[in-house]
Amino acid sequence: MVRPAEGALATTPVAHESHELFGGDSTTCIVSVDADANGRARVWRRLGEHVELSEHTFPNWFLATSLELLAHLPAERLSADWLRQQHGHIQVHEPLAVVDLETSGPADQDAYRYLVLTSNLAEIETTLLETASKREGEEAQTLAELRGLVLIWEPVEQFLTLTGRTYFKDMSFEALRRFQFDLETTGLDEGRDRIFMISMRDSTGWRASLDIGDLGEADLLRRFVELVIARDPDTLENHNIFGFDLSFLVRRAARLGVRLALGRDGSEPRLETDVFDNGERPEPFLRWRVVGREVIDTQHAVRRYGLAAPDMRRHGLKEAARYFGFASSDREYVPGAEIWATYRTDPDRVRRYAAHDVDEVDGLSRRLLPPIFELTRRLPRGYERVAADTGPGSLWELLMVRAYLHAGRAIAAPAPRLQRVGAPARSELFMSGLLGPCARAEASPLLPRVLVNGSIAATNDDLQVMPRSLGWLLHRSDDSAARLLATAAHAYLSSAGLFGDPHAALDASMLARHYVELLVRDLRAHGCTPIEIDAEQVVFGVPTWWTPEMERAVSESARTYLPAGVELEFRARYVALYARAPGTSITLAHDGSVTLVGPAFRAGRLERFGDRFMHRAAACLLQWDVVGLRAVFLETLSLLRGGGIDLNDLCVQVTLHKSPSQYRRGGTHEEPYEVLLVEDSELTAADADADYYVARLSGLYCQQFAQAFTREDFSRIFRIPPGSGPFEAADPSDFDDIRPIATSLV
């Protein structure tokens, strides 16, 4: 139930240790914000079973380096003192106002010295763009494209930054009302296929299922909307919710004339562009925005987790649930292509399958989203935006801008990005090939501590916001959100962001590498063989006499040279390790598990047959079983030539951003979509190009093991025999003289 607020929201200054990390306003329990370019904001707060709505006006704003493009417009001029006094309560009485921000020294012509406040952003934007086009030759379409002259953020972020509010203050993740739903459809084309079932549950334990056994499709969608309104969730969640469920739902509703009033104001979902960034690379996607509710894709959370967990090979819902161990023992599985046919003969089986789907989405949400919830408590960004984008710039930039506005300070231009040599490589390999018992140790948290202890900051961070904030974060080592922010600090400093300074970042990297090299020297003194430096981690071979007591001795020794607050932590121990390249290795743990680490082994880029081959081959290699390695190769070769591998296992998984009907309308030729359009054809593995896949096996997958053998021995193990197989088992005597090797690279 949504009820209007009886009065204005409290704006008491926040009592946390650092307003820079939590915002300067103490308003509690915000679960969603909607704001627009006309200076209107709506804020929803969860108060137990009820949701309170309050409406606000605020000036839209942007930062500018010059007022030249606005010189012909009348504007109220305000001081930095006024801004400091009004922070959190800012209102202007003229359509345009300019705050002269304080500078730390002589005025920098490239500094963002002006905070421009307006009650008519659309008109100001049009005027600015026209003037820029005439005077500067800038052909920008939006203010965001005038970077260097203007900095602007989207309206929700403007509202939160200006007011000092954040989501979720004094609220637990368990108090958030989360709603999971999953569609079952007759196919993937919303133009011709239908929704025949929707399974639902929420975080209170309520659950329901709708299907066309009782309703027509249009009535099914209407009833779904009624249930969402009645349950009034704060979040809508599913796995690949943007790539499939909401897109399909919106387009089927439009085709059937059903108003999909899922917003808390009765509005329908609207499409926006957004960016998914897990810290590896930004990836644009189309987001469906539901007013008053945050839309969360658990696939984003799984992909983010998978970047740091090389043993997570796939990011699908079922695979992730099995990985985390909450897939039910009686979990119902139905192959995707068979779901509609199964429903027609055994609808209860499909109902169980769909119910298990939403249970697993809830499990992923509970497992992976609490740190994002805690991050959102600190940042002037919406929960759904933080959940999709945890790139370093998204975490730090607005946080720092908020601190500078709170202080009424201008933001100087970033330091010029001049070429500077000597930056240490993130990963450095000392040995390649197969090595015996090994361990992995990490000096943690080294880079954040170096930044704090040395007060290392960007040249234009004259308020020292980053090192001061980092100091607070490092005292919260048990806080997962604090760790995420602290870990991202150096990456942001290295970036081309507003407070990026690659020279300062390089100074920190060089100092951190110095400490890691001291650790390498110490390990050698204790009889260990360094194999690789990987950022703040060192992988090393251990002597036969290595004991837990020796680990403790190395840890004690490390305290004498590592910075205060940095501890040496032993992360893992391995029976054997194959070092292929910097940042790329295969390990055998004491429990027998094999883990492939590094971009060359990223499962999403590999056919399943190749991924399976490498795991089996690696298990043989790491146990010095050359005969077994040859047998795995021959077996895989025989299956490929004989059409014995399932067609799905010959495919590379790709993410599609358009529906089949959208692709058809586009008139382009894109191979993944062409494959999708013939998915119903009777293709089998026998139709696959066997020679192509044999070449993939030999030229890609086998080559991953080349550093483990001499060139001659490698050729003998992976020699391709004539014929289609099956092939005779390898004679052990043929390989008696082959031994895996290790090679020193220094």
PLM region descriptions:
Residues 1-428, 432-439, 443-466, 470-480, ...:
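The two-metal-ion catalytic cores of nucleic-acid processing enzymes
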Residues 153, 440-631, 635-642, 646:
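Conserved catalytic core of nucleic-acid polymerases
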